[in-house]
Curated annotation (Swiss-Prot):
It is a peripheral membrane protein. Inactive GDP-bound Rho GTPases reside in the cytosol, are found in a complex with Rho GDP-dissociation inhibitors (Rho GDIs), and are released from the GDI protein in order to translocate to membranes upon activation. One of its GO terms (cellular component) is cytoplasmic vesicle. It comes from the Eukaryota. It holds the Pfam family Ras. It is found in: Cytoplasm; Membrane. The lineage of its organism: Eukaryota, Viridiplantae, Streptophyta, Embryophyta, Tracheophyta. GTP binds at residues 15-22, 62-66, 120-123. One of its GO terms (molecular function) is protein kinase binding. Belongs to the small GTPase superfamily. Rho family. May be palmitoylated. A motif (Effector region) lies at residues 37-45. This is Rac-like GTP-binding protein 4. It comes from Oryza sativa subsp. japonica (Rice). InterPro entries: P-loop_NTPase, Small_GTP-bd, Small_GTPase, Small_GTPase_Rho.
Length: 215
């Protein structure tokens, strides 16, 4: 029990400003939905969580999506085990920025770290009054979310609503599972990297060449 509880998982949420990252974190950790928008006021959270019989110490990091934080935000990426990359189902711009901004940023600062793609504000996509008030709005469909997941290589795609708490727990359960039980392809990539490093090292020793790096 002690050994499993000592497993620490750092989960970092990223995505455009105002897509609901902070609300999702507050909802998950306190079962409350903040009615007012307050940009990124979530304190880092850490607690023991049990998923599929495994106890882990889950650490949650919130980040600001605004451009003013572009230099500071990557500091939170160091040591991340998994990213929750969020966009709003009622914001086409935030959906498009997953490919334009967030994937390049994560690949640059944290290559190889698994991503859970999340579509937030599910309740608004199905809210007729909200859609009538925003006649030019074209919500993101589930199929489009799945297509984006394939494009960026995310481990899974989940749609959630912090207001109704629908699938909020599922988001972070998925983030934990991808770390403690990596997908087969991810494990295979790690094994291949290890084999390539060993092969390169052995060849270097055999030929008595000076090694300056591992590939």
């Amino acid at each position: 029990m002690a050994s499993s509880a000592s497993r620490f998982i750092k989960c970092v949420t990223v995505g455009d400003g105002a897509v609901g990252k902070t609300c999702m974190l507050i909802c998950y950790t306190s079962n409350k939905f903040p009615t007012d928008y307050v940009p990124t006021v979530f304190d880092n959270f850490s607690a023991n969580v049990v998923v599929d019989g495994t106890t882990v110490n889950l650490g949650l990091w919130d980040t600001a999506g605004q451009e003013d934080y572009n230099r500071l935000r990557p500091l939170s990426y160091r040591g991340a085990d998994v990213f929750v990359l969020a966009f709003s189902l009622v914001s086409r711009a935030s959906y498009e920025n997953v490919m334009k901004k967030w994937l390049p940023e994560l690949q640059h600062y944290a290559p190889g770290v698994p991503i859970v793609l999340v579509g937030t504000k599910l309740d608004l996509r199905e809210d007729k009054h909200y859609l009538l008030d925003h006649p030019s709005l074209v919500p993101v469909t589930t199929a489009q979310g799945e297509e984006l997941r394939k494009h960026i290589g995310a481990t899974c795609y989940i749609e959630c609503s912090s207001k109704t708490q629908q699938n909020v727990k599922a988001v972070f359960d998925a983030a934990i599972k991808v770390v403690i039980k990596p997908p087969t392809k991810q494990r295979d990539r790690k094994k291949k990297k290890t084999r390539r490093g060993c092969s390169f090292f052995c060849k270097g020793v055999m030929s008595r060449r000076r090694l300056v790096c591992f590939k």
